[in-house]
């Protein structure tokens, strides 16, 4: 347990940040899984729709500071490549 006022505040902030990061990480994993499942099911429309949602959310997480721009672009690019392989 923290003994100083500033240490107590840092502990509170760490808890909040951890919960927020867990929420973002879970959302990203679920959205990515939705795209991959649609590709495995060979459902082009669902894959494209899921990819659009992934793209929007990844870049919104960039603006919130959860991801770096290059990281989000890399993930979206790889998922787009999967979806395009299904279309082609």
From Swiss-Prot:
**What keyword terms does UniProt attach to this protein?**
Ribonucleoprotein, Ribosomal protein, RNA-binding, rRNA-binding
Please list the GO terms describing molecular function.
small ribosomal subunit rRNA binding; structural constituent of ribosome
Name the InterPro entries for this protein. Answer: Ribosomal_bS20, Ribosomal_bS20_sf
Tell me, in a sentence or two, what this protein's role is: Binds directly to 16S ribosomal RNA.
Annotated region described as Disordered, given as residue ranges: 1-20
**A biological process from GO:** translation
Q: Provide the protein name.
A: Small ribosomal subunit protein bS20
Gene Ontology cellular component list = cytosol; small ribosomal subunit
By sequence similarity, the record places it as follows: Belongs to the bacterial ribosomal protein bS20 family.
Q: What cystine linkages occur within this chain?
A: none
Q: Which domain of life is it from?
A: Bacteria
Short name of one Pfam family: Ribosomal_S20p
């Amino acid at each position: 347990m923290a003994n100083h006022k500033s240490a107590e505040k840092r502990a509170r902030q760490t808890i909040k940040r951890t919960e927020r990061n867990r929420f973002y990480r879970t959302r990203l994993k679920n959205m990515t899984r939705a795209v991959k499942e649609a590709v495995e099911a060979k459902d082009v429309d669902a894959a494209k729709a899921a990819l659009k949602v992934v793209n929007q959310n990844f870049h919104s997480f960039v603006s919130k500071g959860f991801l770096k721009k290059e990281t989000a672009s890399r993930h979206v690019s790889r998922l787009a490549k999967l979806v395009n392989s299904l279309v082609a």
